[in-house]
């Protein structure tokens, strides 16, 4: 294998929009996510609706659907 061509593999802090944080390893020092295992409906068992309206509106705007 060639030396000095791979990115640095460091400890990473993952921050969720709900406020939960946890550590893992990655080539980035910080990652921000919208949902995690503490707030995702599959893991919590609640019927929380994950906001996807923004993505749908963006798609419709981009491709001209009304």
Curated annotation (Swiss-Prot):
Required co-factor(s) are: Zn(2+)
Hydrolase as a keyword of this entry, yes or no, is no
Task: Report whether Transcription shows up as a keyword of the record.
Answer: no
Binding residues annotated for Zn(2+), in chain numbering: 16, 18, 36, 39
Q: Name one GO molecular function term.
A: rRNA binding
Q: How does it assemble?
A: Part of the 50S ribosomal subunit.
Provide the protein name.
Large ribosomal subunit protein bL31
